[in-house]
Amino acid sequence: VLKRAEEEIRFIEDHGIRPLFYQDEDYPQRLSHCDDSPIMLYYKGNADLNADRVVAIVGTRNITDYGKANCEQLVKDLSDDNVLVVSGLAYGVDAVAHRSSVKYGIPTVGVMGCGMQTVYPSDNRDLAEEMLQNGGLLTECMSGSQPDRENFPRRNRIIAGMSDAVVVVESALKGGSLITAEL
């Protein structure tokens, strides 16, 4: 156990990751009010996780052209406000929300369902790098944690818990987006 802890500390230090503990000033305060908030988060980036307004934008991975246009317009409309956009760095709505935030200069944070060593899906690796310039990446998963199915509902509770509002751009009748909105 001690060896694993030493490896984790080394990984954090080598990759510029900040551990945020539940009572730290930089820990997302909205999330700290949730009964199931994580004791610790791993954060890499420069966005204020306690911005005046935090808006989660979520939705289907299979976004339509109509959904893309609506998502981009929503983000553009938020660009005049002091807002942080949060999403899950997945395909579809999440990626459009993050890309649009980068485009309009809005801080955006991707909450991941795996450790910081992996960007999932890997197609979003370049997007994740861009987000580090004005935003960041956040996870409760230790290094080495893979993007396993059970991690995504836990990720979704962080997205909802740290946000003032959850906007579902486009979704199937059943799925993670509507579950996130209900949280």
Residue ranges and their predicted role:
Residues 13-183:
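Glycine-biased, small-residue-rich flexible motifs in mid-sequence functional cores and linkers
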